[in-house]
Amino acid sequence: MKTSRRRFLALSALGLAAATRPSVSQAQNLPKPPQPARLRLSCQEGVAPGKTLTEKLDFLEAHGFEGIEPWGGGLPGRVEEFQKALRGRKIRISAVCAGFEGVLISEQEEVRQKAIRSIKEILTAAGALGAVGLIVVPAFHGQTKLGHVDGRELLVKLLPELGEHAHKAGTRILLEPLNRRETWFLRQLADAAAICRDVNHPGVAVMGDFWHMTWEEPSDFAAFVAAGSYLQHVHIASRKERKMPGEDEGDNYVDGMRGLKFIGYQNFISFECGSKGDPRQSIPAAVRLLREQWAAA
Protein backbone atom coordinates (compact mmCIF):
# COMPACT_ATOMS: atom_id res chain seq x y z
CA MET A 1 0.00 0.00 0.00
CA LYS A 2 1.36 3.34 -1.01
CA THR A 3 1.57 6.08 1.62
CA SER A 4 1.72 9.73 0.67
CA ARG A 5 4.34 11.96 2.26
CA ARG A 6 1.58 13.99 3.96
CA ARG A 7 0.03 10.83 5.46
CA PHE A 8 3.44 9.57 6.55
CA LEU A 9 4.23 12.82 8.36
CA ALA A 10 0.80 12.88 10.00
CA LEU A 11 1.14 9.30 11.25
CA SER A 12 4.68 9.99 12.45
CA ALA A 13 3.52 13.02 14.41
CA LEU A 14 0.74 11.02 16.05
CA GLY A 15 3.17 8.28 16.97
CA LEU A 16 5.64 10.74 18.45
CA ALA A 17 2.94 12.43 20.50
CA ALA A 18 1.77 9.10 21.88
CA ALA A 19 5.30 8.02 22.68
CA THR A 20 6.27 11.21 24.47
CA ARG A 21 3.03 11.95 26.34
CA PRO A 22 3.49 10.80 29.96
CA SER A 23 0.96 8.29 31.23
CA VAL A 24 -0.84 8.79 34.52
CA SER A 25 1.57 6.41 36.24
CA GLN A 26 4.57 8.23 34.73
CA ALA A 27 3.23 11.61 35.85
CA GLN A 28 2.83 10.25 39.37
CA ASN A 29 6.46 9.10 39.32
CA LEU A 30 8.02 12.42 38.31
CA PRO A 31 11.01 13.16 40.56
CA LYS A 32 10.24 15.28 43.58
CA PRO A 33 12.60 18.05 44.67
CA PRO A 34 14.93 17.19 47.57
CA GLN A 35 13.09 19.75 49.70
CA PRO A 36 9.90 21.78 49.23
CA ALA A 37 10.30 25.19 47.61
CA ARG A 38 9.86 28.31 49.74
CA LEU A 39 8.52 31.75 48.88
CA ARG A 40 11.16 34.16 50.13
CA LEU A 41 10.53 37.73 49.05
CA SER A 42 13.21 40.35 48.50
CA CYS A 43 13.15 43.94 47.27
CA GLN A 44 15.76 46.08 45.61
CA GLU A 45 17.06 48.82 47.87
CA GLY A 46 16.03 51.51 45.39
CA VAL A 47 12.47 50.16 45.16
CA ALA A 48 11.79 50.05 48.91
CA PRO A 49 10.31 53.26 50.38
CA GLY A 50 12.30 55.17 52.96
CA LYS A 51 14.89 57.92 53.12
CA THR A 52 17.53 55.83 54.88
CA LEU A 53 18.65 52.21 54.78
CA THR A 54 17.19 51.72 58.26
CA GLU A 55 13.79 53.03 57.16
CA LYS A 56 13.82 50.75 54.12
CA LEU A 57 14.71 47.71 56.21
CA ASP A 58 12.03 48.54 58.78
CA PHE A 59 9.40 48.76 56.04
CA LEU A 60 10.46 45.53 54.35
CA GLU A 61 10.60 43.55 57.58
CA ALA A 62 7.17 44.84 58.60
CA HIS A 63 5.72 43.40 55.38
CA GLY A 64 7.34 39.99 55.52
CA PHE A 65 10.35 40.45 53.26
CA GLU A 66 13.37 38.27 53.98
CA GLY A 67 15.84 39.96 51.64
CA ILE A 68 17.09 43.28 50.30
CA GLU A 69 18.98 43.61 47.01
CA PRO A 70 21.51 46.47 46.80
CA TRP A 71 23.09 47.95 43.68
CA GLY A 72 26.63 46.74 43.08
CA GLY A 73 28.12 50.13 42.22
CA GLY A 74 29.90 51.46 45.31
CA LEU A 75 29.04 48.36 47.35
CA PRO A 76 32.65 47.62 48.41
CA GLY A 77 32.54 50.89 50.33
CA ARG A 78 29.20 50.06 51.99
CA VAL A 79 29.92 46.63 53.45
CA GLU A 80 30.24 47.89 57.02
CA GLU A 81 27.10 50.03 56.61
CA PHE A 82 25.04 47.00 55.61
CA GLN A 83 26.57 44.76 58.25
CA LYS A 84 25.64 47.23 60.99
CA ALA A 85 22.16 47.87 59.57
CA LEU A 86 21.36 44.15 59.31
CA ARG A 87 22.66 43.21 62.75
CA GLY A 88 19.89 41.72 64.88
CA ARG A 89 17.44 41.53 61.96
CA LYS A 90 15.98 38.51 60.18
CA ILE A 91 16.30 40.20 56.78
CA ARG A 92 19.52 39.62 54.80
CA ILE A 93 21.17 40.54 51.52
CA SER A 94 19.55 38.48 48.77
CA ALA A 95 21.64 39.23 45.69
CA VAL A 96 23.64 42.18 44.40
CA CYS A 97 22.41 43.85 41.22
CA ALA A 98 25.19 44.47 38.69
CA GLY A 99 26.85 47.89 39.06
CA PHE A 100 30.19 46.82 37.61
CA GLU A 101 32.23 48.77 35.09
CA GLY A 102 33.29 47.62 31.63
CA VAL A 103 31.69 44.99 29.39
CA LEU A 104 32.46 41.34 29.95
CA ILE A 105 32.27 40.25 26.30
CA SER A 106 33.61 43.41 24.70
CA GLU A 107 35.84 42.92 21.67
CA GLN A 108 38.33 45.23 23.38
CA GLU A 109 40.71 43.59 25.85
CA GLU A 110 41.01 46.66 28.09
CA VAL A 111 37.22 46.93 28.42
CA ARG A 112 36.96 43.23 29.32
CA GLN A 113 39.71 43.52 31.91
CA LYS A 114 38.00 46.53 33.45
CA ALA A 115 34.85 44.44 33.81
CA ILE A 116 36.76 41.52 35.34
CA ARG A 117 38.46 43.73 37.93
CA SER A 118 35.22 45.50 38.81
CA ILE A 119 33.21 42.28 39.05
CA LYS A 120 35.80 40.73 41.35
CA GLU A 121 35.69 43.74 43.68
CA ILE A 122 31.91 43.55 43.94
CA LEU A 123 31.99 39.76 44.36
CA THR A 124 34.27 40.16 47.36
CA ALA A 125 31.80 42.60 48.91
CA ALA A 126 28.84 40.36 48.01
CA GLY A 127 30.51 37.42 49.69
CA ALA A 128 31.24 39.44 52.83
CA LEU A 129 27.53 40.27 53.01
CA GLY A 130 26.37 36.69 52.43
CA ALA A 131 24.69 37.44 49.11
CA VAL A 132 23.48 34.60 46.91
CA GLY A 133 25.35 36.16 44.01
CA LEU A 134 26.16 39.12 41.79
CA ILE A 135 23.89 39.65 38.79
CA VAL A 136 25.90 39.89 35.57
CA VAL A 137 24.65 40.82 32.10
CA PRO A 138 27.44 39.95 29.62
CA ALA A 139 26.52 42.79 27.23
CA PHE A 140 23.64 45.11 26.40
CA HIS A 141 22.82 46.32 22.89
CA GLY A 142 25.69 48.29 21.37
CA GLN A 143 28.28 47.21 23.95
CA THR A 144 30.08 44.62 21.85
CA LYS A 145 30.77 43.95 18.20
CA LEU A 146 31.22 40.22 18.74
CA GLY A 147 28.72 37.89 17.14
CA HIS A 148 26.80 35.30 19.12
CA VAL A 149 29.24 32.43 18.57
CA ASP A 150 32.35 34.45 19.42
CA GLY A 151 30.60 36.14 22.34
CA ARG A 152 29.54 32.84 23.85
CA GLU A 153 32.96 31.31 23.35
CA LEU A 154 34.60 34.26 25.08
CA LEU A 155 32.12 34.20 27.97
CA VAL A 156 32.71 30.49 28.59
CA LYS A 157 36.45 31.20 28.58
CA LEU A 158 36.21 34.06 31.10
CA LEU A 159 33.68 32.65 33.55
CA PRO A 160 35.86 30.02 35.28
CA GLU A 161 38.18 32.73 36.62
CA LEU A 162 35.27 34.82 37.85
CA GLY A 163 33.47 31.76 39.18
CA GLU A 164 36.53 30.75 41.17
CA HIS A 165 36.80 34.22 42.70
CA ALA A 166 33.08 34.14 43.53
CA HIS A 167 33.30 30.66 45.05
CA LYS A 168 36.23 31.59 47.27
CA ALA A 169 34.29 34.67 48.41
CA GLY A 170 31.28 32.50 49.27
CA THR A 171 28.98 33.75 46.51
CA ARG A 172 28.26 33.31 42.77
CA ILE A 173 28.06 34.93 39.38
CA LEU A 174 24.38 35.10 38.37
CA LEU A 175 23.98 35.27 34.60
CA GLU A 176 20.82 37.19 33.70
CA PRO A 177 19.02 36.67 30.37
CA LEU A 178 17.31 39.84 29.13
CA ASN A 179 14.62 40.55 26.56
CA ARG A 180 15.39 41.31 22.91
CA ARG A 181 14.90 45.05 23.34
CA GLU A 182 17.88 45.17 25.70
CA THR A 183 20.27 42.58 24.30
CA TRP A 184 20.71 40.16 21.44
CA PHE A 185 22.90 37.92 23.57
CA LEU A 186 21.54 35.54 26.23
CA ARG A 187 17.75 35.90 26.23
CA GLN A 188 16.48 32.57 27.60
CA LEU A 189 17.14 30.68 30.82
CA ALA A 190 17.93 27.45 28.98
CA ASP A 191 20.76 29.21 27.14
CA ALA A 192 22.16 30.56 30.40
CA ALA A 193 21.92 27.10 31.98
CA ALA A 194 23.76 25.59 29.01
CA ILE A 195 26.58 28.08 29.53
CA CYS A 196 26.73 27.10 33.21
CA ARG A 197 26.88 23.45 32.18
CA ASP A 198 29.78 24.14 29.82
CA VAL A 199 31.66 26.22 32.41
CA ASN A 200 30.96 23.58 35.08
CA HIS A 201 31.88 25.68 38.10
CA PRO A 202 29.91 26.03 41.37
CA GLY A 203 30.57 29.77 41.32
CA VAL A 204 28.57 30.30 38.11
CA ALA A 205 24.77 30.19 38.16
CA VAL A 206 21.63 31.68 36.58
CA MET A 207 18.87 34.07 37.53
CA GLY A 208 15.48 34.54 35.91
CA ASP A 209 13.33 37.66 35.59
CA PHE A 210 9.58 37.37 35.06
CA TRP A 211 9.63 40.69 33.18
CA HIS A 212 12.17 39.56 30.58
CA MET A 213 10.61 36.10 30.47
CA THR A 214 7.29 37.66 29.44
CA TRP A 215 8.85 38.52 26.07
CA GLU A 216 11.25 35.62 25.58
CA GLU A 217 9.97 32.41 27.17
CA PRO A 218 7.16 30.26 25.70
CA SER A 219 6.50 28.90 29.19
CA ASP A 220 7.57 30.22 32.59
CA PHE A 221 7.27 26.70 34.01
CA ALA A 222 9.48 25.19 31.33
CA ALA A 223 12.04 28.00 31.62
CA PHE A 224 12.54 27.49 35.35
CA VAL A 225 12.64 23.72 34.99
CA ALA A 226 15.24 24.07 32.22
CA ALA A 227 17.39 26.22 34.51
CA GLY A 228 17.04 23.63 37.26
CA SER A 229 19.66 23.68 39.99
CA TYR A 230 21.53 26.48 38.21
CA LEU A 231 18.69 28.88 39.10
CA GLN A 232 19.71 30.86 42.18
CA HIS A 233 17.76 34.15 42.02
CA VAL A 234 14.54 35.54 40.50
CA HIS A 235 13.30 39.06 39.72
CA ILE A 236 9.63 39.97 39.48
CA ALA A 237 7.58 42.91 38.16
CA SER A 238 4.22 43.48 36.49
CA ARG A 239 4.11 41.84 33.10
CA LYS A 240 3.27 44.76 30.81
CA GLU A 241 4.81 47.92 32.24
CA ARG A 242 7.36 46.60 34.75
CA LYS A 243 5.53 48.08 37.72
CA MET A 244 4.48 46.39 40.96
CA PRO A 245 3.09 42.87 40.57
CA GLY A 246 -0.67 43.28 40.31
CA GLU A 247 -0.58 46.82 38.90
CA ASP A 248 -1.03 45.51 35.35
CA GLU A 249 -4.18 43.70 34.32
CA GLY A 250 -3.72 39.96 34.17
CA ASP A 251 -0.50 39.75 36.21
CA ASN A 252 -0.16 36.03 36.71
CA TYR A 253 2.91 34.18 37.94
CA VAL A 254 1.35 30.82 38.82
CA ASP A 255 2.89 28.91 35.91
CA GLY A 256 6.37 30.07 36.85
CA MET A 257 5.77 29.44 40.53
CA ARG A 258 4.81 25.86 39.67
CA GLY A 259 8.17 25.56 37.97
CA LEU A 260 9.92 26.93 41.05
CA LYS A 261 8.09 24.42 43.21
CA PHE A 262 8.96 21.62 40.78
CA ILE A 263 12.70 22.27 41.16
CA GLY A 264 12.50 22.91 44.90
CA TYR A 265 13.69 26.52 44.60
CA GLN A 266 15.07 27.83 47.90
CA ASN A 267 16.25 31.37 47.22
CA PHE A 268 14.66 34.78 46.70
CA ILE A 269 12.06 36.35 44.43
CA SER A 270 13.09 40.00 44.38
CA PHE A 271 11.11 43.08 43.35
CA GLU A 272 12.80 44.94 40.48
CA CYS A 273 10.13 47.35 39.32
CA GLY A 274 8.57 50.77 39.49
CA SER A 275 5.20 51.61 40.99
CA LYS A 276 2.16 53.32 39.54
CA GLY A 277 0.98 54.29 43.00
CA ASP A 278 2.48 54.94 46.41
CA PRO A 279 4.85 52.01 47.06
CA ARG A 280 3.78 52.04 50.71
CA GLN A 281 0.44 50.76 49.44
CA SER A 282 1.42 48.95 46.24
CA ILE A 283 4.15 46.81 47.83
CA PRO A 284 1.90 45.25 50.51
CA ALA A 285 -0.74 44.62 47.83
CA ALA A 286 1.87 42.91 45.64
CA VAL A 287 2.99 40.76 48.56
CA ARG A 288 -0.59 39.58 49.14
CA LEU A 289 -0.98 38.76 45.44
CA LEU A 290 2.23 36.74 45.29
CA ARG A 291 1.39 34.79 48.43
CA GLU A 292 -2.04 33.96 47.00
CA GLN A 293 -0.58 32.84 43.68
CA TRP A 294 2.17 30.83 45.38
CA ALA A 295 -0.48 28.97 47.36
CA ALA A 296 -2.40 28.32 44.13
CA ALA A 297 0.67 27.08 42.22
Tell me what each language-model feature is.
Residues 2-42, 51-61, 131-132, 186-208, ...:
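Histidine-acidic metal/acid-base catalytic patches
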Residues 7-20, 28, 33-36, 105, ...:
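Active-site acidic/histidine proton-transfer and metal-coordination neighborhood
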Residues 47, 66, 70-163, 242-244, ...:
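Structural motif corresponding to the early beta-alpha repeats
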Residues 41, 93, 173:
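Hydrophobic anchor at the start of a short beta-strand
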Residues 63, 89, 169:
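Conserved dinucleotide-binding and phosphotransfer motif residues
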Residues 42-43, 99-100, 180, 239-240:
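Residue-level signal for pocket-adjacent positions within structured domains
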